[in-house]
């Protein structure tokens, strides 16, 4: 079976070896754990953002950039594709691990989750778990992890701490904006999984989302990066699953009762409590499904340029 950690390790090794060329910085801790800073104390950029996102996807996704526009305003877009959507998105990219050790906090994603089984139910549903002697984790945090944090990750992954590798970037950073927009496909796969659909029937997935401008405040940055997919994420899924027609009206974000405002405003109204937000909002704006068994195509949802530009501070 494919090892998402083995594939991601290849990308990490290249990033570590040529860190300066990625506007990143490589660190080896006293216990042997290795870290590449992609934005905490470094500039990062598109090249680092691509590597970070592809690491998150366990080496089973491809990332490209292009210039597009939203209502005539030039905007960078990220394009993501994968032929292993269930494993790459749910088994690796999903931010399913809250890493908290002492005063350190980070949202953990990436292939290390498939060793630690975070959360276990996800891996039971998709029928996957990894078996490799190194763990590669992506941490969304304003701070680099110390040795104690890396020891904790190693213990959870059942590997030696010297075999733990982490890439780190804050939400409010160029790489932060890139890698969250790079979750546009994952958002669609995650939504279908939450609806009870068997995502292993999805053969391939491709999607795009605008890369929002970096905000100074982490909470506002989180709002913009979520809005990139909620209001302007466009996804195409190829699958063999005639039953998908029963899920169509629940997939896009515009079916959520919270839809229509920038995410920051919704979050503020909810007193910055995620548990008060309608989770169905976390969906792509527009989805096309090519169902191969019956040879049909479905199209649901629509992009919302107005809210997207308002969120980005361009309207």
From Swiss-Prot:
GO molecular function, one term: methenyltetrahydromethanopterin cyclohydrolase activity
Enzyme class: hydrolase
Keywords: Cytoplasm, Hydrolase, Methanogenesis, One-carbon metabolism
Compartment list: Cytoplasm
Xref: InterPro entries: METHMP_CycHdrlase
Keyword Cytoplasm set for record: yes
Family note: Belongs to the MCH family.
Protein name: Methenyltetrahydromethanopterin cyclohydrolase
Protein's gene: mch
